[in-house]
A protein has these predicted regions:
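Bacterial N-terminal signal peptides
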Residues: 5-15
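Sec/Tat signal peptide C-region and signal peptidase I cleavage site
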Residues: 17-20
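Glycine-rich phosphate- or other oxyanion-binding loops that anchor nucleotides, phosphorylated ligands
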Residues: 22-29, 54-300
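Short, conserved "active-site rim" segments that organize catalytic pockets and cofactor/ligand binding
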Residues: 27-47, 64, 69
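N-terminal/domain-start segments enriched in small and hydrophobic, helix-friendly residues
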Residues: 50-52
């Protein structure tokens, strides 16, 4: 009998984490996601009625932003972290839409540091294959033929999305929600963006919000002029980061509306001097947060 009691207790102990993995909050909320801590203060400061939950080390903050119910969390840097934490949020909260707010590298020569980009589709620029080198150049090898773009040995291509007994869906671009893009386009002209960090520490231009165009993400920090030019030409991308396409991928599979606001903290290797992220990270984060606040306040 004592042995049976011990076994039951052990089974209950193993079952506890599964039971705890249910919903933590039933209120329909907009998920507002950032990658890492420097992108968070302006959003947290704009959130009232805060309650905190911690799941496997990830902190989720519920509350109200511009009067709308939200849940905020940090995805963590890079693709796997972003996918993992986004799915955690979907599993534990009643997420009605996903909004990403953060900084990124600009690849469109027409854009500058401090500008905010709201891309209409996101792809993964390092999803694909590293090709074998042959006598006549790089050889495609046993890889799907619909190669999207190449940079030397790197061949980017679509991902396969499982569909049960049906053939997998092959997709490179993951779209932002059209209705959310309309809201973004409506509020964008009226949002004041910062040009200066402090007296004497100002950008040479007044930042702007750009709605539309493409963005790409990958598990590398890009600070390389040649690769930046490749991304702009091959993907017709405006912006490059390390998380958004992964979040868009998860949102697409879960049929959850998604949109991302990325403010340029640097030019991904296109800067005239050293990379500017350490100089303009705070300004870019606050510009992105300002647009997100206006966007959330305009939601129905």
């Amino acid at each position: 009998m004592r042995l049976l009691t011990v076994l039951i207790a052990a089974l209950l102990a193993f079952a506890a984490p599964a039971a705890a993995a249910g919903r933590l909050d039933a209120t329909p909320r907009t998920a507002v996601v950032s990658a890492y801590a420097p992108e968070w203060p302006a959003l947290l400061a704009a959130t009232t009625d805060q309650a905190r939950y911690t799941v496997n080390g990830v902190v989720f903050v519920t509350g109200r932003m511009e009067g709308r119910p939200v849940v905020l969390f940090l995805s963590g840097v890079s693709m796997v972290n972003a996918a993992m934490t986004t799915q955690m949020a979907l599993d534990r909260f009643a997420v009605s839409r996903i909004v990403f707010s953060g900084v990124a590298g600009g690849v469109d020569p027409a854009l500058g540091v401090g500008d905010v980009v709201v891309a209409d589709a996101w792809g993964q620029h390092l999803e694909g294959a590293f090709l074998r080198e042959g006598p006549q150049g790089f050889v495609p090898g046993p890889w799907p033929p619909e190669r999207v773009a190449g940079f030397g040995m790197i061949a980017a291509g679509p991902v396969e999305l499982p569909r049960g007994d049906q053939p997998p869906e092959r997709r490179f671009w993951f779209p932002a929600d059209p209705a959310l893009l309309q809201v973004a386009a409506w509020i964008a002209p009226a949002v004041p963006l910062k040009r200066c960090l402090a007296p004497g520490r100002c950008l040479s231009h007044q930042p702007k919000v750009v709605v539309g165009g493409r963005g790409v993400s990958g598990p590398v920090f890009v600070d390389n002029k040649a690769y930046r030019e490749h991304v702009a030409a091959a993907f017709q991308a405006k912006v490059l980061d390390m998380e958004t396409a992964a979040v868009a991928h998860v949102a697409y599979v879960n049929r959850t509306p998604f949109i991302a606001f990325r403010s340029l903290s640097d030019l991904a290797g296109g800067d005239e001097g050293a990379n500017q992220i350490e100089t303009f990270l705070t300004l870019a984060s606050e510009n992105s947060a300002a647009v997100v606040r206006a966007f959330v306040g305009a939601l129905p």
